[in-house]
């Protein structure tokens, strides 16, 4: 089962990934994400948001600062631990729990918005997951999914240079490359 491999990998990566997220929260990227999300968010002063695959709490912190209530779920306990620490350090609160996004423990039509960043490629059954997400989304709510092609550096020389520079920086800072998984 793919989820077992994914879970094992990200349990081990939680601390390093959290450091990257903390840096990202201080960058222009965070402001760009916030603007993009709020552009597509339902027009409500206080949104109930579900962050699927929340990792170390990027959206919980960003949207929490805007006055929205964010519930974050992740399949890995270590990511939830990092998210709790990061949200607390930011002086915010969020509901954070370990949960498989294919089987959500929420009533129908719970959330105004569901956001998901960079997990679709890890799902065992994307159709089942999307169906489940839509079940807990309120009528008129928004589902925002962002994923990436992580292997452009294999096909594009310019992307390869960027990837190699970032990988070298990771080696210098952490003593290892971008990904520590043997298949990456």
Feature-to-residue mapping (PLM):
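A short glycine-rich, Lys/Arg-flanked "PGG" loop and its adjoining helix->strand segment in the class I
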Residues: 127-142
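A conserved beta-strand element that flanks and buttresses the S-adenosyl-L-methionine
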Residues: 115
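Short catalytic micro-motifs in class I SAM-dependent methyltransferases
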Residues: 118-119
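Class I SAM-dependent methyltransferase SAM/SAH-binding core
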Residues: 50-103
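Short alpha-helix
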Residues: 184
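Short N-terminal helix/helix-N-cap motif within the alpha/beta-hydrolase-1
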Residues: 78, 123-128, 153
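Conserved class I S-adenosyl-L-methionine
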Residues: 1-44, 58-62, 82, 142-181
């Amino acid at each position: 089962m793919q989820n077992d491999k994914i879970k094992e990998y990200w349990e081990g990566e939680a601390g390093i990934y959290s450091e990257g997220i903390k840096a990202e929260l201080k960058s222009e990227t965070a402001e760009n994400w916030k603007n993009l999300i709020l552009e597509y968010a339902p027009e409500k002063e206080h949104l109930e948001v579900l962050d699927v695959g929340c990792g170390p709490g990027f959206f919980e912190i960003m949207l929490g600062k805007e006055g929205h209530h964010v519930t974050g779920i992740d399949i890995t306990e270590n990511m939830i631990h990092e998210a709790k620490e990061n949200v607390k350090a930011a002086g915010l609160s969020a509901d954070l729990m370990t949960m498989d996004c294919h089987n959500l423990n929420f009533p129908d039509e719970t959330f105004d918005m569901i956001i998901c960043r960079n997990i679709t490629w890890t799902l065992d059954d994307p159709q089942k997951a999307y169906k489940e997400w839509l079940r807990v989304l309120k009528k008129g709510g928004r589902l925002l999914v962002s994923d990436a092609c992580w292997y452009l550096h294999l096909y594009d020389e310019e992307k390869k240079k960027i990837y190699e520079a970032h990988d070298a920086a990771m080696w210098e800072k952490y003593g290892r490359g971008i990904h520590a998984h043997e298949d990456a």
